[in-house]
Amino acid sequence: MANKNAYAQSGVDVEAGYEVVERIKKHVARTERAGVMGALGGFGGMFDLSKTGVKEPVLISGTDGVGTKLMLAIKYDKHDTIGQDCVAMCVNDIIAAGAEPLYFLDYVATGKNEPAKLEQVVAGVAEGCVQAGAALIGGETAEMPGMYGEDDYDLAGFAVGVAEKSQIIDGSKVVEGDVLLGLASSGIHSNGYSLVRRVFADYTGEEVLPELEGKKLKEVLLEPTRIYVKAVLPLIKEELVNGIAHITGGGFIENVPRMFADDLAAEIDESKVPVLPIFKTLEKYGQIKHEEMFEIFNMGVGLMLAVSPENVERVKELLDEAVYEIGRIVKKENESVIIK
């Protein structure tokens, strides 16, 4: 007679996998939106594009993970916000192209299925989807003993959005004289964490550093990535934005030039950048060169908009938050980003 426990003996707990599915159903239900078809658990997630009302739809997709920020979530045993980070990294990328997020899929790979922990992860994904207006229509949880340690897991996601063909943001509308507006980040977001972990390798995370305004270090390091979708979508609908840059890995230097043509450059006034305390702390404790900080981190600006001068006031009115005029678009001479 075949051994019914053979799979379990190899390290895969099928029953725990079933429990994960049951636990996450209520979180997935929070994300439902018009267009979703079928129930959770099918072989593929379905979405009716006609429900969006877009006349000339162009699908825009993005995929990403959260890098080694996951290692801090595991170290500090805090798993309820890392899913929001994953969603943010994907949807902020596609909103930069003018897309309204429609749906999201996640992938979690782990050494051992721990239903309570994985529920926290997916709850964070669901919260991110709610903030982005995207439905969580599918995903995969893979138990991979031998590939990962029992406490380890990896997380990635995939977002699909839609844009009116006439409202796609591809850099072609950005011109000399456009004003650069910065939207505040919530913190480090989800890049640069290999360096962050090195700087704070000897810290427990419980420390309240004087530079961090009374917060524990671990709270600041795991602050979830801001999702900009609901703030920026109205600007796209009114065609008020010429270019958008999501400031992630590579900081200002790598990401800002992605929103304009090769013959243009961004001239940024550093004094106008709302640098958050964590970045000053990283620079100080890590002895990082000041100019290198702008090559790695968002420095307090998670999303940058290129806007025609005549539209600046309307953009500020719609955003209804602190908006930072940090620079302008100029003709390129040498560098693509000039920080003064």
Swiss-Prot record:
It holds the Pfam family AIRS_C. It is found in: Cytoplasm. Keywords: ATP-binding, Cytoplasm, Ligase, Nucleotide-binding, Purine biosynthesis. Pathway: Purine metabolism; IMP biosynthesis via de novo pathway; 5-amino-1-(5-phospho-D-ribosyl)imidazole from N(2)-formyl-N(1)-(5-phospho-D-ribosyl)glycinamide: step 2/2. One of its GO terms (cellular component) is cytosol. One of its GO terms (molecular function) is phosphoribosylformylglycinamidine cyclo-ligase activity. HAMAP family: AIRS (MF_00741). Belongs to the AIR synthase family. This is Phosphoribosylformylglycinamidine cyclo-ligase.
